[in-house]
Swiss-Prot record:
Residues 319-350 are annotated as: Oligomerization. GO terms for cellular component: centrosome; cytoplasm; endoplasmic reticulum; mitochondrial matrix; mitochondrion; nucleolus; nucleus; PML body. This is Cellular tumor antigen p53. Residues 93-294 are annotated as: Required for interaction with ZNF385A. Zn(2+) binds at residues 169, 172, 232, 236. The gene is TP53.
Amino acid sequence: MEESQAELGVEPPLSQETFSDLWKLLPENNLLSSELSPAVDDLLLSPEDVANWLDERPDEAPQMPEPPAPAAPTPAAPAPATSWPLSSFVPSQKTYPGSYGFHLGFLHSGTAKSVTCTYSPALNKLFCQLAKTCPVQLWVSSPPPPGTRVRAMAIYKKSEYMTEVVRRCPHHERCSDYSDGLAPPQHLIRVEGNLRAEYLDDRNTFRHSVVVPYEPPEVGSDCTTIHYNFMCNSSCMGGMNRRPILTIITLEDSNGNLLGRNSFEVRVCACPGRDRRTEEENFHKKGQSCPELPTGSAKRALPTGTSSSPPQKKKPLDGEYFTLQIRGRERFEMFRELNEALELKDAQAGKEPGESRAHSSHLKSKKGQSPSRHKKLMFKREGPDSD
């Protein structure tokens, strides 16, 4: 191969040259500066020095100086585990009309499957779909002062969850389908069609609320209507997780002082009409009275007189005698012997009279007759010509 390349006058590639050929290609002038040359020469060892050192210590392998160990990095503080924020403050849910007669109202709607929002007066509960309009009417007996605001806040209804802040599930927080650019993604309650709405996160209680200025009713109207949206289903895992919630509506002045308070339960579901009809039927079956608006406790008390056990039937009176007319001597003798045998059996066993009558009626039912049960029979002897 080399001869063929030499004949053709082709030089081998650079990688095929010897080290001496490559060393000759280096420039003769010293690349190191004059200042660094002495120091570098002191560090270099000649081949004779290396051979002498190995002869003196053949058992010892050359050891390279260990580089200094890098300083151990300061361990970073562990990130706090993500958990639901807890609040030490539980807002009151007691109805307070105040001096302005503040109370809420809702539009009348049925339980059809097509409804997106319906209110049950018997349950004081609003059933609605996700992100659908929920009109809430604000009624006052006299106009509140200027600068009055309306605040809406959600809390859990059951006492074991009241300290937990109500917020949306992680899935709906990341979902951008219902984002309006105004409300924070973790807020459950939004106000529809009001650019003056303020979404607040309390630094002390960590609770979410939405505040809008109170507007007096329009001409020809007796109430003010605010359209709310609930942005997460009640069944969402990681959010409400099937835990009932209450929405508290408060009327406040410009300084935050309370002027009135009212509340109602909310269920966000796929079919509000069906769920309302089902819960109302269960409510009436249990015989519960209409619940008052939530006070100190959100649970309804069951009536003490309600009992699930069926009423017991009255037992027939003991010691009654009945006359049974039987046609035919042969049949009469058969029933008479049967009755005497039962009486004798009861006398020998020492049973109670009620038990003997029950056993006697059971035997008579097997014979195809239908006399009154639990009755003692008394027969009247008749002649062969009687009917």
